[in-house]
Amino acid sequence: RDRSVSRGLGDVYKRQQYDGTGPDCIRVCFHKSQALQAVELCRKIKDKGYKVYFQPMVALSYSDAEYLGLIGMANKFRPDVFYIVDSHGSMKQKDVARFFYLIENNLDKEIAVGFHSHNNLQLSYSNAQYLAALHTDHNLIIDSSIMGMGRGAGNLNTELFVEYLNETADADYSTEPILCSIDNTIAPIYLTTSWGYSLSG
């Protein structure tokens, strides 16, 4: 059995009801073949009082009909966030638009929309800008990491995206703590465990 969705299940099933302390959300990532198993897991997590971030990996592997089926299941068990996941960093803007509008027109408005991207084609930043500019009736969550820290090609850079939001969306994020984190913590890690675009794979 693929371990992606089952990793850590023992901890989930052993967890007591959420008591208001510690992490309050659990991210459930799964491949298409694991959708029913993932939905059942999400229900159990919700029953224990945790928030659920529903992340069907490799969105591009789904047809419109299959993705609409996922949305229909989500409308029934009601995760806190339904994610568009670009696992291979291969989404172009037209792909982001396709999945966004399937969600926008069919997902319950009380469920937030998330976007989790990898940066293989160096499009995480432009795709995030595109999403942020769209009108939506949902709350929108866009994942990022400082200095793009992440597996393989890495993820959307927090320091770039918050500056973009400050300039275009009347946001008021302070970039100084982020830059200090880069200098003091993240950059030294990068020297020994690098990530990012590479022709050598």
Regions found by a protein language model. Give the residues of each.
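Single conserved hydrophobic/aromatic residue that forms the stacking wall/gate
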Residues: 2-13
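Acidic (Asp/Glu)-rich catalytic clusters
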Residues: 14-23, 39-49, 71-78, 104-107
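Catalytic beta/alpha-barrel core
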Residues: 24-35, 55-60, 81-91, 114-116
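Short hydrophobic alpha-helical runs that function as membrane-insertion/retention elements
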Residues: 27, 53-54, 140-144
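Active-site-adjacent beta->alpha loops and helix N-cap segments on the catalytic face
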Residues: 31-48, 60-67, 89-103, 153-158
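Catalytic alpha/beta core domains of metabolic enzymes, predominantly
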Residues: 81, 85-192
